[in-house]
């Protein structure tokens, strides 16, 4: 007669079927207590929460911040254009023909909006180029430095209208040195130098086109109907607006990318 322990401790043969075992996930779910008294599951890590719930909130926040920065830069460009144009008119540097004043271009109402739009484009372009090149600008990133840069730029523009040199070549070389000094003091980035030169070239071309078509004119033009020092003003203005755009972009989350 077989004994009980022979059946209990007998090892199954190779051909015998192995007992079925539940998956670990089902076992864990069965062992976890359910009901109102059960402990709440641990929250997911912060990175995972930002990757799911934050993904849908970031695009709207990014676009909202973009609009805010555009409005700030546009307002700055409008105010700066009014101030600098007033300095130029006081020194009798810029003259508007009578036939232009009598038309819709009276008091040059179109100049401040154009300068504001250009300031918004340039101010948004600088941090975008930095992000694209993978070289974030970290040199003197504080508002005090930005305000000093604005003051130096206004001083350069005021000097272009007030200082009297023996000839315009000396004035142009002096302003070019001051503009490069402004870039070296407040920027020192290759992208800032390249964008400043590009802005100076394009803005001078547009100004030459407007002067050539009689929209306005300069007293004593010395280089293709315009002042030869004008590219220096555009260069230093581009660097100044770029610093403002970079400062406004600090702490702004990057544009979300959809995989």
From Swiss-Prot:
Covalent cross-link (Glycyl lysine isopeptide (Lys-Gly) (interchain with G-Cter in ubiquitin)), residues: 138, 140
Entry annotated with the keyword Hydrolase: no
List of residues that carry Phosphoserine: 189
Motif interval(s): KxHxx: 253-259
Tissue specificity: Highly expressed in liver and kidney.
Stretches in topological domain Extracellular: 90-108, 165-167, 214-227
Disulfide bonds listed in the record: none
Topology relative to the membrane: Multi-pass membrane protein
Subcellular location(s) per record: Endoplasmic reticulum membrane
GO molecular function: oxysterol binding; protein sequestering activity
Modification after translation (UniProt): Phosphorylation at Ser-189 by PCK1 reduces binding to oxysterol, disrupting the interaction between INSIG1 and SCAP, thereby promoting nuclear translocation of SREBP proteins (SREBF1/SREBP1 or SREBF2/SREBP2) and subsequent transcription of downstream lipogenesis-related genes.
Induction of its expression: By insulin and hepatectomy.
Protein family per UniProt: Belongs to the INSIG family.
Entry domain remark: The KxHxx motif mediates association with the coatomer complex.
Name of this chain's protein: Insulin-induced gene 1 protein
Lineage: Eukaryota, Metazoa, Chordata, Craniata, Vertebrata
């Amino acid at each position: 007669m077989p004994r009980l322990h022979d059946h209990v401790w007998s090892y199954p043969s190779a051909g015998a079927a192995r007992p079925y075992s539940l998956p670990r996930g089902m076992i864990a779910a069965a062992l976890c207590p359910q009901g109102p008294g059960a402990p709440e599951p641990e929250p997911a890590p912060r990175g995972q929460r930002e990757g799911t719930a934050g993904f849908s909130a970031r695009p709207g926040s990014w676009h909202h911040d973009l609009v805010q920065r555009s409005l700030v830069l546009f307002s700055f460009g409008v105010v700066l254009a009014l101030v600098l144009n007033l300095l130029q008119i006081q020194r009798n540097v810029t003259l508007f023909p009578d036939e232009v004043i009598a038309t819709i271009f009276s008091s040059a109402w179109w100049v401040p909006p154009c300068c504001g739009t250009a300031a918004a484009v340039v101010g948004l372009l600088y941090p975008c180029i930095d992000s694209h090149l993978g070289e974030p600008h970290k040199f003197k990133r504080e508002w005090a430095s930005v305000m000093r840069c604005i003051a130096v730029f206004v001083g350069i523009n005021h000097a272009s209208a007030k200082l009297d040199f023996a000839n315009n070549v000396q004035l142009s070389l002096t302003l070019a040195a001051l503009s490069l000094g402004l870039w070296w003091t407040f920027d020192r980035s290759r992208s800032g130098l390249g964008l400043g030169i590009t802005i100076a070239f394009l803005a001078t071309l547009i100004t030459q086109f407007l002067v050539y078509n009689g929209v306005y004119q300069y007293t004593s033009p010395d280089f293709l109907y315009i002042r030869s020092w004008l590219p220096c003003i555009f260069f230093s203005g581009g660097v100044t607006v770029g610093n403002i755009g970079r400062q406004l972009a600090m702490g702004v989350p990057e544009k979300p990318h959809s995989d």
